[in-house]
């Protein structure tokens, strides 16, 4: 297997989904690098969690520690400058007239994947892994399978490189995502994700629940909590 085919770049935010995807990639590729983005988001809690999660995941399995490669963080503040959303402004979370919550940052995943592909191109990496999902999600159009497939074609044509965008969570519920984490890394990985990853839109780390830290009221917390309860209840 060539180095291009043996290496993956994971979009790693510090949340539940991206941490599960990191474990998924470590289970399948010989070397895995991670990339995160500082885009002027409302809080930087997830970014702060990333180092602890990388350290923790490396301690779970020696082979994962050996495979875990470079970490990259890109600054793209322009995304926040052109986005009036609840993830980039201190405003209440609510539904918009278009049926999308105002947590939707237009083009965010498209921008992330494009920057990831540009970095992957420079580093000779063909495989890019993201935690997009259209099963338990808020209707974000840039999380849809058809969007990711179309972008894979565009990036491959635009850079003359046969990129493959992997979305292992695309058809999984949040309960099934918890189960996948258990299948990959046992209780140790589940506990690491529960205790150290961050999902809450409001950046709340003070409150501790059985499913992890968060306000417990925002859509992201509610989705994570519902998935946890279904997982522990055997409904994954």
Swiss-Prot record:
Cofactor(s) annotated in UniProt: Zn(2+)
E.C. designation(s): 6.3.4.20
GO MF annotation, one: ATP binding
Signal peptide: none
Alphabetical list of InterPro entries matching this protein: QueC (IPR018317), Rossmann-like_a/b/a_fold (IPR014729)
Binding-site residues for Zn(2+), renumbered to this chain: 200, 215, 218, 221
The keyword Nucleotide-binding appears for this protein: yes
GO biological process: queuosine biosynthetic process
The record's free-text note on cofactor binding: Binds 1 zinc ion per subunit.
Keyword Metal-binding included in the entry's annotation: yes
Catalytically driven reaction(s): 7-carboxy-7-deazaguanine + NH4(+) + ATP = 7-cyano-7-deazaguanine + ADP + phosphate + H2O + H(+)
Key words of the record: ATP-binding, Ligase, Metal-binding, Nucleotide-binding, Queuosine biosynthesis, Zinc
Pfam family name, one: QueC
Pathway given in the UniProt record: Purine metabolism; 7-cyano-7-deazaguanine biosynthesis
Binding site for ATP: 12-22
HAMAP family per the UniProt record, alphabetical: QueC (MF_01633)
Similarity remark: Belongs to the QueC family.
Known function: Catalyzes the ATP-dependent conversion of 7-carboxy-7-deazaguanine (CDG) to 7-cyano-7-deazaguanine (preQ(0)).
Protein known as: 7-cyano-7-deazaguanine synthase
Species name: Bradyrhizobium sp. (strain ORS 278)
Gene: queC
């Amino acid at each position: 297997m060539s180095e291009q085919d043996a290496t993956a770049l994971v979009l790693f935010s510090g949340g539940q989904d991206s941490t599960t995807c990191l474990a998924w990639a470590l289970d399948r590729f010989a070397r895995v690098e991670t990339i995160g983005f500082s885009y002027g988001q409302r809080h930087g809690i997830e970014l702060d969690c990333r180092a602890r999660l990388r350290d923790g995941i490396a301690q779970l399995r020696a082979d994962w520690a050996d495979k875990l490669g470079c970490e990259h963080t890109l600054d793209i503040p322009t995304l926040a400058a052109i986005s009036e959303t609840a993830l980039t402004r201190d405003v209440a979370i609510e539904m918009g007239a278009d049926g999308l919550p105002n947590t939707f940052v237009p083009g965010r995943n498209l921008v992330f994947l494009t920057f990831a592909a540009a970095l992957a191109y420079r580093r000779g990496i063909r495989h890019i892994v993201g935690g997009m999902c259209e099963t338990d999600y808020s209707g974000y159009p840039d999380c849809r399978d058809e969007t990711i497939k179309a972008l894979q074609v565009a990036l491959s044509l635009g850079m003359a490189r046969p990129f493959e965008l992997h979305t292992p969570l695309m058809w999984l519920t949040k309960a099934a995502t918890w189960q996948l984490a258990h299948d990959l890394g046992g209780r140790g990985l589940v506990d690491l994700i529960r205790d150290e990853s961050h999902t809450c839109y409001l950046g709340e780390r003070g409150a501790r629940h059985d499913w992890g830290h968060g306000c417990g009221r925002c859509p992201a917390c509610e989705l994570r909590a519902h998935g946890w309860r279904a997982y522990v209840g055997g409904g994954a």
